Design a protein with these regions (language model features):
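Radical SAM/AdoMet-radical enzyme domain recognition
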Residues: 1-76
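Short loop/turn segments at secondary-structure transitions that flank enzyme active sites
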Residues: 9-11, 43, 70-72, 139, ...
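Long, K/E/R/D-enriched contiguous segments that form extended
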Residues: 50-120
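C-terminal accessory region of radical SAM enzymes
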Residues: 84-115, 138-185, 189, 193, ...
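Short, small/polar residue-rich loop motifs at catalytic or cofactor-binding pockets
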Residues: 124-128
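Short, acidic, Ser/Thr-enriched surface-loop or helix-capping motifs
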Residues: 134
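Radical SAM enzyme core and accessory elements
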Residues: 172-255
């Protein structure tokens, strides 16, 4: 079992996101230095993203990862701020290759433009052997299925299903989107925000941010492997596949 702090960034970020004025990082850095911090990216504090990652990587020298929170609503203004922050991070990460690429970037772009998986055996991650526990000791297969998210009655109802399928959205806008095959659709969030697992919560929440993630992840991949390719070295197949995906993304910026 791993133990690590949930910290969203520098002190200003945690105050905005969670109303936390105390700085808890020193406690975790002292007793669990190897596990690092994990954060959630919210639109209200996105302008601190680059500064937060640089602070953890350089000043604290403490592992830090962050990803966009499920169900957070991103409007055009917030998405534009995200693009600016990711642009700064792209240049920073290329200049500092020793630092790991945070999860706010999409690591596998090779499936962009592919047909959406239509597999009845394709389950969400909540059914892949994971487990979370509420304070009353009750076990759930995923934190998004807990009463804190759905309320007690609905949570029990959903968890009594044999398995919760990840279904590709039936929304017209989603069916024609070339990013559908890699869209971070979560059936639990779909139920919470759209009332059914086969209508996309992403469409009404994180869609604008996800498209910015795609664009800037493609940009980072191109920057990262530009010199590698120019040297004429043998290029691994996964790099070629992702370069192809990156090229398609950057030529379909409107998605």
């Amino acid at each position: 079992m791993n133990c690590g702090p949930s910290i969203d960034g520098i002190a200003e970020v945690n105050k905005i996101n969670r109303g936390v004025n105390r700085d808890i990082k020193d406690f975790f850095m002292k007793y669990w230095p190897e596990y690092g911090a994990h954060g959630t990216l919210f639109p209200d504090s996105v302008e601190y993203l680059y500064e937060s990652i640089r602070y953890f990587y350089e000043d604290l020298k403490y592992p830090f990862d962050i990803k966009i929170g499920l169900g957070t609503v991103w409007n055009e203004e917030a998405a534009n701020k995200l693009e600016k922050q990711l642009g700064l991070l792209c240049n920073y990460l290329v200049k500092n290759p020793k630092f790991s690429i945070p999860s706010v970037f999409i690591k596998d772009l090779s499936k962009f433009g592919s047909e959406a998986i239509d597999d009845p055996n394709f389950n969400c991650l909540g059914n892949q052997g994971g487990a979370v526990y509420d304070i009353d000791g009750k076990q759930y297969s995923c934190e998004t299925l807990m009463p804190l998210v759905h309320g007690l009655k609905k949570s029990i109802e959903i968890n009594n299903l044999n398995r919760l399928m990840r279904e590709y959205a039936t929304d017209a806008e989603c069916r024609k989107c070339p990013a559908l095959a890699i869209c971070p659709t979560c059936p639990s969030m779909n139920i919470k925000y759209r009332g059914t697992s086969n209508k996309s919560a992403t469409l009404t929440t994180t869609c604008k941010a996800f498209k910015v993630q795609l664009k800037m992840s493609a940009y980072l991949f191109m920057l990262k492997y530009e010199d590698y390719i120019m040297r004429g070295s043998d290029v691994p197949s996964f790099v070629l596949d992702n370069l192809e995906g990156s090229t398609r993304i950057l030529s379909n910026l409107s998605l």
